[in-house]
Design a protein with these regions (language model features):
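Long, glycine/tryptophan/cysteine-rich extracytoplasmic
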Residues: 2-85, 147-217
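C-terminal substrate/ligand-recognition segments
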Residues: 83-95, 133-138
Length: 217
């Protein structure tokens, strides 16, 4: 940005006004950054498009505001890590909501306690419903933010700047929902495994007890 100021030969007053304009533009750029960060990207009219795989702004006007736009990420593992952010966030949030006391507090009964089937079903049904609602809210809110961040800087080449709303919403919503329901499935499989192990141990003990009883005639 500073280099663009120097190349454009702006005076102090023009630099201040341009900086204010850049700051006012930051909320939109931050929303575009979410789309870029999760693999969708954004476009500046038909002059340039920016994703983690490619980013070329040489056709853009030499405005300092365009100096804050990102470059492509050349390291593959960094791209993979960034793409996994919504999934990992959803997974950790789902596990926390299901296990913590302030959430649904899903717990396994002690071995000597009887299994309350209705309570067990409710313990998984409520989180499933909550995760469905959360996934829908993420999709709706992200699509609204992406739509509001779009706009125009002109009537020809810069007539449309911003993100593709549907594609960006999908990049945010799908992995987040997948992370939430992966957490639900992990808890379900883990609890089923514990119950299965307990059942096997009980059967082994019963078999040993039956074989150790003396035979009477």
């Amino acid at each position: 940005v500073v280099k663009l100021y120097e190349l454009s030969g702006m005076q102090t007053g023009s630099r201040i006004l341009t900086t204010v304009a850049v700051i006012a533009w930051l909320p939109n750029v931050m929303i575009w950054a979410v789309s870029w960060l999760f693999g969708s990207g954004f476009a500046i009219g038909d002059l340039a498009s920016f994703t983690m795989w490619s980013g070329q702004g040489s056709a853009l006007p030499g405005l300092p505001a365009f100096g804050i736009l990102p470059q492509a990420v050349s390291t593959p593992w960094i791209r993979i890590a960034l793409l996994c952010i919504p999934f990992v966030t959803g997974l950790l949030a789902g596990l926390a909501v299901m296990l913590f006391d302030r959430g649904f507090a899903v717990r396994i009964n002690k071995p000597d306690q009887p299994i309350d089937v209705s309570r067990l079903i409710a313990g998984f049904a409520y989180p499933a419903g909550a995760f469905c609602i959360a996934s829908a809210l993420v999709a709706v809110l992200s699509s609204m933010l992406f739509a509001l961040s779009n706009g125009a800087l002109g009537t020809k080449h810069l007539a449309h700047i911003g993100v593709q709303v549907i594609a960006s919403t999908r990049k945010v919503g799908q992995p987040t929902a997948l992370g939430l329901f992966s957490a639900w499935l992990i808890i379900l499989v883990g609890m089923a495994a514990v119950f299965g192990i307990r059942w096997l141990i009980r059967r082994v003990r019963e078999a040993r007890g039956a074989s150790s009883e003396p035979n009477t005639i």
